């Protein structure tokens, strides 16, 4: 009995222990080679699976979110703020757009400083206005642009004009035709001419508004008049 106890004490002190036989474990080479399927079918502990899954993920790396999973705050920040223009600003912008559709950087900067707007906003307004103008031009709803000269010559609606306004066609009727032949005083007796002849101004803008309608008499050439008899002059002189 002393022999086995001494042997066990020596095994405990050396740290070497035999495998217990009741567990059914055998560490021989034959047993290991004969049972490969049994080793594969053994369930792995859950702790090992968790460690393997942790090792596959790189520490410190974050997966990128798809665009649809982005927060709403980021989408709101990306939206552009719409600019509200005042009436004076729109008038200045439309006036320059009527003059040119493609202003350069210097003109845009001057206009932006005058109407208190950023130059980028002015550029965006011109881009949108050009697109709107092209769309209206294609649809056929675009009205003919007014020339700057016509805008300056147009009379205001509240202007009080005394007398009839002479149109260009009416002005041409006042100017005597150049092909008319003037009757000289030597061809007619002196009694046919009054003492004072009112002079008609030659400039249309010097004419005063006439009370009645304008009538144009045809000019009769001098060769259509028959020669005057000497007695006719004496008759006209006695009648006057």
Swiss-Prot record:
Q: What is this protein called?
A: Intestine-specific homeobox
- Keyword terms, alphabetized: Activator, DNA-binding, Homeobox, Nucleus, Transcription, Transcription regulation
Write out the function statement from the record. Transcription factor that regulates gene expression in intestine. May participate in vitamin A metabolism most likely by regulating BCO1 expression in the intestine.
Recorded hits in Gene3D superfamilies, A to Z, give: Homeodomain-like
Q: Which gene encodes it?
A: Isx
Stretch list, region Disordered: 36-82
Q: Where is the protein localized? A: Nucleus
Q: Which GO molecular function entries does the Swiss-Prot or TrEMBL record give?
A: DNA-binding transcription repressor activity, RNA polymerase II-specific; sequence-specific DNA binding
Q: Which GO terms describe its cellular component?
A: nucleus
Primary residence: nucleus
InterPro entries in alphabetical order: HD, Homeobox_CS, Homeodomain-like_sf, Paired_Homeobox_TFs
Q: Name one GO biological process term.
A: negative regulation of intestinal absorption
From which organism does this entry originate? Mus musculus (Mouse)
Query: Which residues does UniProt assign to DNA binding?
Result: 78-137
Please give the knockout or disruption phenotype noted for this protein: Mice appear healthy for at least 1 year and display normal histological features in the gut. They however show defects in intestinal gene expression with a dysregulation of the scavenger receptor Scarb1.
Which residue stretches does the UniProt record annotate as biased composition, category Basic and acidic residues?
Answer: 62-76
Q: In which tissues is it expressed?
A: Expressed in intestinal epithelial cells from the duodenum to the proximal colon.
